[in-house]
Amino acid sequence: MHGKVTTIPEYILDLVPQTEIDLHCYEQLNSSEEEDEDEVDNLQKQPQQARQEEQHPCYLINTQCCRCASAVQLAVQSPTKELRALQQMLMGALELVCPLCATRR
């Protein structure tokens, strides 16, 4: 652009209106209310014991830091077999370190 007066054609090179895109969805859905009710009924019929077996209880382990002897609390959720393995490690050579000592190294 050279000159003292600016003209619009220098800025607008080609303006072409875009064709409009149809955003309407023509898909029709089947009524899924019956399916949802069936799923809810199945969950209610499922025995309470089976639901509890899916979720393992959370255990809190309270111990001391092996470096500074401050309290350390560890929350664990696992099946019984893995908890027994953790118990054996904690009774053996595995020691827990508090966050403060862990950052000090």
From Swiss-Prot:
Residues 32-41 have a biased composition (Acidic residues). Highly phosphorylated. A motif (Nuclear export signal) lies at residues 83-91. One of its GO terms (biological process) is symbiont-mediated suppression of host innate immune response. Gene3D superfamilies: 3.30.160.330. Residues 1-45 are annotated as: E7 terminal domain. A zinc finger (unnamed) spans 65-101. Pfam families: E7. Residues 30-49 are annotated as: Disordered. A motif (LXCXE motif) lies at residues 23-27. It is found in: Host cytoplasm; Host nucleus. It comes from the Viruses. GO terms for molecular function: DNA binding; DNA-binding transcription factor activity; protein domain specific binding; zinc ion binding. The keyword Transcription applies. Keywords: Activator, DNA-binding, Early protein, G1/S host cell cycle checkpoint dysregulation by virus, Host cytoplasm, Host nucleus, Host-virus interaction, Inhibition of host innate immune response by virus, Inhibition of host interferon signaling pathway by virus, Interferon antiviral system evasion, Metal-binding, Modulation of host cell cycle by virus, Oncogene, Transcription, Transcription regulation, Viral immunoevasion, Zinc, Zinc-finger. GO terms for cellular component: host cell cytoplasm; host cell nucleus. The E7 terminal domain is an intrinsically disordered domain, whose flexibility and conformational transitions confer target adaptability to the oncoprotein. It allows adaptation to a variety of protein targets and exposes the PEST degradation sequence that regulates its turnover in the cell. Plays a role in viral genome replication by driving entry of quiescent cells into the cell cycle. Stimulation of progression from G1 to S phase allows the virus to efficiently use the cellular DNA replicating machinery to achieve viral genome replication. E7 protein has both transforming and trans-activating activities. Induces the disassembly of the E2F1 transcription factor from RB1, with subsequent transcriptional activation of E2F1-regulated S-phase genes. Interferes with host histone deacetylation mediated by HDAC1 and HDAC2, leading to transcription activation. Belongs to the papillomaviridae E7 protein family. Homodimer. Homooligomer. Interacts with host RB1; this interaction induces dissociation of RB1-E2F1 complex thereby disrupting RB1 activity. Interacts with host EP300; this interaction represses EP300 transcriptional activity. Interacts with protein E2; this interaction inhibits E7 oncogenic activity. Interacts with host TMEM173/STING; this interaction impairs the ability of TMEM173/STING to sense cytosolic DNA and promote the production of type I interferon (IFN-alpha and IFN-beta). This is Protein E7. It comes from Human papillomavirus 30. The lineage of its organism: Viruses, Monodnaviria, Shotokuvirae, Cossaviricota, Papovaviricetes.
